[in-house]
Amino acid sequence: MILIIFSVFFITSCMTKDEKSVSATIDFWTFPNFTSESGKAGDFEQSLIDAFRKENPSIKINFKLLSFADGGKEIQDAIDKGNPPDIIYDAPGRILLWANSGLLEPLDDVLATEKPYITVGLLAVSAGKDRRTYMYPIHCGPFSMAFNKEMLEDLGLIDLLPYTRRDRQWTLGEYEKLLSALRSKLPSEKTPGVFFYKTQGGDQGTRAFLVNLYGNARLLNGDYSQYVFNTPNAVKNLDWTVKAMKTGLLFDGKDMTSNDAIQMFVESNAAHTILYSPQLNKMYDGKRNYKGKDFTPIYMPFPNSSSAPVLEFLAGGACIFKTSNKHRTKATKKFLHFMATDEVWAQKVINATGGFPASSKVSVETKDPEILYNSVLQRFYGQYYNNINGFGDMRGYWNTALKNAASGKDIQSVLDVFVRDSNNSLKK
């Protein structure tokens, strides 16, 4: 009898030990989504790994920092070779393409106790066609415009920016008045702002810009089954933008990327940028310069003369690739759960992104009124379409449309072609 009891105890103890301890080596890849206190890229991720391994020494993590320039290709090459990383921190667009191709591990088990605390909209954009969750949503944040506060104050134009107005909504007329005043007061080597379109990069900024302005110009219909950006107001918005570039209200960014345009803002060569966010602001800490000092970016929604503004937004999180090695999968899920829910490190992850937490369990640690204002901007989130069929193709058609319109081609015809080609991409 004693022998039987001892045997049961021994077997149970071994099972418990096996459940708690996992021995595996996993690969963790991410784009530059996080900033570190040292200012060195990758230091934060390594600190996160070190903290996790302190509690889980039997799990080794190989870390790779991808670049936005060629990171997507590196991932695809790894997938093509049948050797993708175990976990990637990215956005829903790419992640759900992998999910719908059967490459990812469902994460509903990891999220089982956390879903009630996560913003419903973020769960929706983290699910695949089978309605299972393939991205663990961790942070989010709006994309908006930003203005150089100190520059506007020095020029005596700060009162033309309605940033003290409740929720800061404003019209195209107010925006145009400010741009005109900036054009007349700025020296010739500086510009009120840049409309960039050299490449596809940062095109969430140009799309958000162009669906606002006069307003009532959606990119897609309500059920995402058809592109509709060729309506009279869509034509008016693009026509206004082309004329603004010709008259100097905006700098013609045909030879400028989104990074170039943001750099002009950061260096105070442009009074405002049409693409900014708390995450981007954090990336440029120590680099903003106006008259030898840092300056205050004032965040603003896009002007809209018909309704509330419509904003693009970022959602970020992690996915896990399928593998036949159950120990690696278990170890990877353990690392993901630590990253998203640890009492100390979940908060640090959000702080390092410069964004807002997807979970109500995690707070925003800042007293900066401009960063806090971005929580107001969340109410203006528009459609999230980065995960629909043909999204990558649509981006190419969008860039072509901007170039054709700026070159003088008929805007209605340009947008008709954009809608036709983009609708065809939905069928792929």
Model-derived features with residue positions:
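Conserved N-terminal structural module of periplasmic/extracytoplasmic solute-binding proteins
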Residues: 6-8, 12-97, 112, 159, ...
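Long, aromatic- and glycine/proline-rich binding clefts that accommodate carbohydrate-like moieties
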Residues: 14, 297-300, 348-404
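Extracytoplasmic/periplasmic substrate-recognition and gating elements
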Residues: 60, 246-247, 287-355, 400, ...
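Short helix-initiation/N-cap motifs at beta->coil->alpha
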Residues: 65-74, 168-174, 253-266
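Hinge/lid segment of periplasmic solute-binding proteins
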Residues: 67, 90-144, 153, 173-174, ...
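Short, solvent-exposed loop/beta-turn-alpha elements that line the ligand-binding surface or hinge
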Residues: 108-119, 165-168, 193-199, 216-236, ...
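Extracytoplasmic/periplasmic solute-binding protein
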Residues: 130-139, 143, 171-226, 270
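Glycine-centered hinge/linker elements that transmit conformational signals in sensory
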Residues: 176-183, 222-258
